[in-house]
Amino acid sequence: MIHGRSVLHIVASLIILHLSGATKKGTEKQTTSETQKSVQCGTWTKHAEGGIFTSPNYPSKYPPDRECIYIIEAAPRQCIELYFDEKYSIEPSWECKFDHIEVRDGPFGFSPIIGRFCGQQNPPVIKSSGRFLWIKFFADGELESMGFSARYNFTPDPDFKDLGALKPLPACEFEMGGSEGIVESIQIMKEGKATASEAVDCKWYIRAPPRSKIYLRFLDYEMQNSNECKRNFVAVYDGSSSVEDLKAKFCSTVANDVMLRTGLGVIRMWADEGSRNSRFQMLFTSFQEPPCEGNTFFCHSNMCINNTLVCNGLQNCVYPWDENHCKEKRKTSLLDQLTNTSGTVIGVTSCIVIILIIISVIVQIKQPRKKYVQRKSDFDQTVFQEVFEPPHYELCTLRGTGATADFADVADDFENYHKLRRSSSKCIHDHHCGSQLSSTKGSRSNLSTRDASILTEMPTQPGKPLIPPMNRRNILVMKHSYSQDAADACDIDEIEEVPTTSHRLSRHDKAVQRFCLIGSLSKHESEYNTTRV
């Protein structure tokens, strides 16, 4: 039993010793970290014309596991020249992968790199192209060395050599705070900080409420000389206005939102005399991290903003959660009323115009059809037939008793030609009084069957033999003789008009020559005999 108690005492003592050792080790580690923090990466002396800075413990060996950042800023229209002392020693390695010094041309760790240096040979003289140099010293956990000492001075920027020395800049600072606010460059002119012809280097200090951070969102941004950071830029600092706290710098055509980690933000605008048209407008919002309190609104992006910022017409969250579903809460403004009225008027006017266009198209389509139907109804077929139908010849008979048997021959000859086409010529002499050529073609007169029957019914002279039928040539000659010789001797009182098959009177009736058979039989017989000879 006693032996068991002794074992327990031994185990307990060992545990106590272990805990005391761990506590001591933790205390030593905390002390070491505090010492490293208090060392501040060597010394740094600044003055108006330049300065000097060194690695930690220089000229003794620098400590392991150390990283130091040095950012040098010159005045406007000045550049930086950096020199390393000859007493220089940093652990050598291939491409300086271990301990090294890295120099960049600008204020950020992503600025263009100038070079990375290590070994026993000090780097050459380094010149910046602008107002800033970014320098980093890194030491790993093994093989420490003496380190470095560097000095720098400011020189005039050759890009502004023709403009001469910069005039003293006017004091231009602003103080702002609260749950939200707007920072804008127009405040410089409104508050009389500088004239329109002066270069400006203004700063806005924004202070958030306790336990709050700051979110910055650009509402308007334009640089007169884009991509020329020496002439105009907008810079954002997080925590102070020193170059070490520079968060972002904008001098191109785009500016992004910035989320600060502290409750103090600094906005800086630089513009020389030829860049005073540069402008910006920025909204700052104070927020707290979740969990959100009762008087705050959760933005779904690890932001809790004041309830008074919800549905205020401005997007205070990273995403517009605070302005969604706010139409029923917002009062209709005069601009909204005018917009709605204008939209109604435009819509009604557009409908009226469309209706008028449709009516016009319908009228234009139906109007030609109406005219065509009207013209078709006005067409008189009788007039058309009167113009194009050839004339109809009417027969006339003699009331006298001196007719001979020649009428029978004439009737027979006319009956043979009653189916011929009607003549379209208006000249009777071309058909009946023409030359031998017209006689051979024959007349185009169309005697109907009724007309021929009238001729056959006429009485003949008994005792006289009928004249035998004649051929077509002889009949045509006789027709010519009738129209030429007997036309002048035709007595109107002895003529009787015989109705024809024409359904109406032609407009050429006055020009129709009626065939008159007069004279003595001897005269016809003599002409007939003469023709046969």
Swiss-Prot record:
Isoform 1 and isoform 2 are retina-specific. Isoform 3 is found in retina as well as at lower levels in adult and fetal brain. Residues 291-327 form the LDL-receptor class A domain. PROSITE patterns: CUB (PS01180), LDLRA_1 (PS01209), LDLRA_2 (PS50068). A motif (PDZ-binding) lies at residues 531-533. GO terms for molecular function: ionotropic glutamate receptor binding. One of its GO terms (biological process) is positive regulation of excitatory postsynaptic potential. GO terms for cellular component: axon cytoplasm; excitatory synapse; extracellular region; glutamatergic synapse; postsynaptic density; postsynaptic density membrane; Schaffer collateral - CA1 synapse. Residues 366-533 are cytoplasmic. Residues 23-344 are extracellular. Residues 41-155, 172-287 form the CUB domain. Disulfide bonds join 41-68, 96-118, 172-202, 229-251, 292-304, 299-317, 311-326. Keywords: Cell membrane, Disulfide bond, Glycoprotein, Membrane, Phosphoprotein, Postsynaptic cell membrane, Receptor, Repeat, Secreted, Signal, Synapse, Transmembrane, Transmembrane helix. Glycans are attached at residues 306, 340. InterPro entries: CUB_dom (IPR000859), LDL_receptor-like_sf (IPR036055), LDLR_class-A_CS (IPR023415), LDrepeatLR_classA_rpt (IPR002172), Sperma_CUB_dom_sf (IPR035914). The chain crosses the membrane at residues 345-365. Involved in the development and/or maintenance of neuronal circuitry. Accessory subunit of the neuronal N-methyl-D-aspartate receptor (NMDAR) critical for maintaining the abundance of GRIN2A-containing NMDARs in the postsynaptic density. Regulates long-term NMDA receptor-dependent synaptic plasticity and cognition, at least in the context of spatial learning and memory. PANTHER family: NEUROPILIN AND TOLLOID-LIKE PROTEIN 1, OVOCHYMASE-RELATED. Interacts with PLZ domains of DLG2, DLG3 and DLG4 via its C-terminal TRV domain. Interacts with GRIN2A and GRIN2B via its CUB domains. This is Neuropilin and tolloid-like protein 1. The lineage of its organism: Eukaryota, Metazoa, Chordata, Craniata, Vertebrata. The gene is NETO1.
